C-alpha cells in the first residue's frame, strides 16, 4: 500500500518534494533533536490524488490519517475529544516551495464546548481556554467554510467598544465565552448548520480546506509569478498545539538569523506575549523586537539563539523561524530559508562565502534572479530628500523609494495603475487577497503589523517598497481617507515613503536611478565566471545601449530600426516615401533619411565599443507610420503636391485586416527593395566610419532580415543587401566583414532552417514574441482577454508571452538549431524576444545550446545570473 502520511520522525529535509518544505524541515528539526511538537505530514501526492478523485479524500488516505492520529495519541498520551486529556492540533499547509501568506492555517483544532471546560479546569486558566476556542471558531469558519473574517472582527470590535477597551488581550474569560457563542451563532446564520463538535469531522474539513487552498486565486497568482507548477500540490502538516496565549509567560514569534532587509549578520525578529502564531504574521498587533525577550525570559532567549546558530550552520543559509513559548517552554514550529530583499540576498551570499560556509557556485545559485530588478529601481534623490521633512516614521519593512497617489484598496491600485497612474497602497494591514494590488503599487504603507507581517514579507519577495506599522495614521477606510501629522489625506493625494528608513513624506520627492552596490559586482563577476551563454541587449538608442553596457551587456541582439523613423523630421521624409508613386520618388525621400539613420548606427557602434550589434531591418507594416491627425495629413499632402483626399486614399489603401501577418518584415523589402538598400548603406557607412576611428575594435555588422518564412524569400532580400554592402565597401576602399542573418519567428522558417542556411543565412535570432503568436495562434495584444479563463480552467499555467513554451515554441527552436547547424556548424543562434530576460526561459536557452540571449537593458543582470545558474545546474547533473 502506498504511504500517504509520515510522522515527523520518518522524514528528512531531502523529502521536500513529498513532504513539502514545512514538513521536510519539521522532520529535519525533529532529527536534530530540537524541541518540535509531535506531528505528521500528509504528502503532496495526497493533494494531487484529492483533485484526481474529484476533490474528495479517498478511504485509503483517510484511513492513514486516522492511524496517525492514533499514533500521535500514543506518543503524547492525549486523545482527540477526550474529557481527561484532550489533544489539540494545528493544521498547516506546506508546499515544496515557500508560499508565504498564500495558504491558510487553522489552530486549536479539536475544541468543542466540553473540551474547553476540561482545559479551563485543568489549566486553571479559563481565559486562555475560551480564547483558544473563539480563535478556532473564527479560523475554521474563515478557512474551511469561507465565512469572511470581517464578520467576526466586527463582533470583537463591538465587544471591545462595549467594554471600553482597546486590546483583545484585555477581554476577560467571560467576554471570550460570550464571543464564542456569538461566533457560533454567526456561523449557523451564514452556513445554515451548527458548528462541528466532532474533532475528526473538524480535521477532515481542515485537511480538505488546505488542499482546496492550493487552487485558490491568490495561490494561483503567486504560482504564476514564481514558476511553481500546479502539479506539485501542497502537503498538510498536523501538529500538536503549543500554546502561546496561556498568559505573560507564554508567547509567539517570528525571527530571522540575519536581517532580511539588509543582510546584516544579526538576529532579527519579533514576538508577542500571550498570543498565538497568526497574531504576529497577520500584523494585527504591533509586536516587540526579539532582543526584549532576553530581558523577559533570559533562559528561553539563550536556548533560542543556540537553536538559531544550529539551524543556520545546518542549512548554510539565513533561516526564517516561527516559535511558540508555552509557559517558559520553547517550541520550534517552522524553519525555512528566509525570504529576503535583493540587497540582503547579495550581502548574505557574499558573507556566507567569506565565512567559508558556501562556495561561489552556491552563492550564485541561491539568489533569485527576478529579485535583482528591485536593485535597479529608483531611490530618492539625496538633495531632495535632505530638503524634505518626514511627517512620520514607521518600520522600514522593504527597501526602495515609493511615491504616488494614495489608494485604499487592492482593486483601486490595480485599476489606477492600469490607467498609467503611479499609486501607493495604504491599508490598515494587508492580507493575501491584496497581492495583485500590491504588485501594481509603487509601494505599500500599513498602519498595523511589523517587519514580519504579510505586507513586509510579500513586498520584500516581490521587490516592492514597504513601510509598516505606522500607528500614527488615523484610518477611515470607508470614506477613503486618513489623517497623519494633523493633515487629512484623500484618495489621489500624493505621498512619498522610504522603505529603507521608514520615513513618510507629504507630497512628491524626486527619485534617481539606484547605485549598484559592491556585493552586486562580486556576484555578477562570479556569475560571468560560470556561465557559457552570452548576454546581449535589445536597444534602439545610444542611451539604452550605454545603460546596458553598464549592466554587463556583451552586444546588441536587437536594434529595431523602425523606432528611429519616428524621431524629429525624419517621420515626414518616411511618410513622403510611403506616399510616393515611383521608385525614383521613394529613393529621393529615403535619401533624406539615410544620413540620419547612419548617424544613429554610428552612435550605437560607439556605445558598444566593438561588441556585436545586430540591426533588424524595417519590420512593422507601413500603415503604422502614416499620419492620423488632420494637420499632419495636410502637411504631407502639401509636401507631395497632392490633395488631402489623395493622401487619405493612400492611407486607406494601406489598411490591413490582419496586419500582424500582413505587409511587413521582409515583405516590405521584396515590394520596396529601395528601403533595404537605404538601410544597408546606412549600416555599412556607419561601420566603415566608426571602424576607421577605432581600428582596434572588431566591428562586424550583423544585418537581420525579419519575418522570413521561405528560403527563396531570404535569398531575394539577401542579394539586395549583399550587392549594396559590397558596393559601399568597394566605394570606400574599406576592409569590412559583415554578416546577414534572419529572425526565426514563423514556424515554417524553423522547420526549413536548413534551407534558409543553404540560402546564405549566417546567424539565426529567435523572435519569440511573434514565434509564440504564430505557434499558438494567440494575438499578444488581445490574449489578456482570455488568458485568465485559461488559467482558471487549467489549460495554461503561465502566460506563454512571459515564459517560453518549451513543448511547442521550444521544440521549434530545437528543430531550427539542429537543422541549421547540420548545414553550417558555426551558425550562431540567439533569442531576442521578451523571453530573453525571463530566468526559466534563459535556462531553456542554455539547455538547447543557444549562443546568446538578448533582453531589455534592465534585465541584463537577471539574464547573466540566470545563465550562470543554468550552467551550474547543468554541471551538477
Which sequence ranges carry the predicted segments?
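Conserved alpha/beta-domain cores
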Residues: 92, 516, 526-877
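Short beta->alpha connector loops at strand-helix junctions that form conserved
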Residues: 40, 447-449, 468-471, 559, ...
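C-terminal domain-closing interface element
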Residues: 333-335, 490-538, 544
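Protease-associated
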Residues: 357-440, 503-509, 520, 524-527, ...
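Nucleotide/phosphate-binding sheet-loop regions of phosphoryl- and nucleotidyl-transfer enzymes
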Residues: 1-388, 421-424, 431-436, 442, ...
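Structural motif
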Residues: 237, 407, 424-426, 445, ...
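Glycine-rich phosphate/ribose-binding loops and adjacent secondary-structure elements
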Residues: 329-331, 431-439, 443-445, 451-457, ...
